[in-house]
Each structure stands twice: as structure tokens, then as C-alpha cells.
Design a protein with these regions (language model features):
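Catalytic Zn2+-binding segment of zinc metalloproteases
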Residues: 76-93
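Short, charged/polar N-terminal "headpieces" of proteins
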Residues: 1-38
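Post-HExxH zinc-binding segment in Zn-dependent metallohydrolases
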Residues: 90-116
Length: 116
């Protein structure tokens, strides 16, 4: 299991990223560490929000690196929506530049921290 962290200072957000080979093996540890209730670990990725400004990105590496990259994009999109809502910004299809930059920032940070 690999655990990395980063901040999004502009929105005062704290992100934990957990990468595991088979998250089912870590379910008890992860549930205690992040105060989770999820017991079904047959997934590619998940987002848990512990508070308005603390989020946990769970990534399951058992499907391989190529699948992992698309999962990071997918979960980064969900996380960008969660963050935008938590800071009071409603998604706007005609003015979505802020969300596009946030999505890129999240994806690039996760990719860099996990050395992918």
C-alpha cells in the first residue's frame, strides 16, 4: 500500500491518495485509518470525503497501470466536482475553466506523487 498527500491551497483542501495492489487485503486497516464504512473493495477507485476539506482517493492497482491512469482521471473528475461544490461553486458548462484547471491539478499531483 502506498499513501501520499497533497494540498489544494487555493480551496483549502487536503487530499490523501491511497494506492493498493488489492484493497480487499487492507479493508480493515483502511476502514480504521480513514473512518470508512465501505466493505466492498472490488473497485478501481473511490473517493471518500471525511469533511468539507479532507478527501481520500482510493486507487486499486490490481487492474494494471494503464487502467490505473484512466481511473485517476475518472476519480479526479469526481473529486473536482466535490471540491467545487464544497467551496460553493456550481458547475457551469459555459464557464468551466476553473474546474478544468482543478481537474488537471488533481490528476498531475496524483500522477507525480505515485511516480507514474
Amino acid at each position: 500500500m502506498k499513501h501520499v498527500k497533497f494540498k489544494i491551497d487555493m480551496y483549502e483542501q487536503h487530499i490523501d491518495v491511497v494506492l493498493c495492489e488489492d484493497c480487499a487485503n487492507f479493508s480493515e486497516t483502511l476502514t480504521k485509518k480513514f473512518k470508512l464504512t465501505e466493505t466492498d473493495w472490488n473497485f478501481s477507485g473511490m473517493i471518500y470525503t471525511n469533511s468539507d476539506n479532507h478527501h481520500v482517493v482510493m486507487l486499486n492497482h490490481k487492474f494494471g497501470t494503464e487502467h490505473l491512469l484512466s481511473t485517476i482521471v475518472h476519480e479526479s473528475f469526481h473529486l473536482s466536482n466535490i471540491i467545487m461544490r464544497s467551496v460553493g461553486i456550481k458547475p457551469d458548462l459555459n464557464n468551466d475553466e476553473a474546474q478544468a484547471y482543478l481537474l488537471t491539478y488533481i490528476f498531475e499531483n496524483i500522477k507525480k506523487l505515485l511516480k507514474l
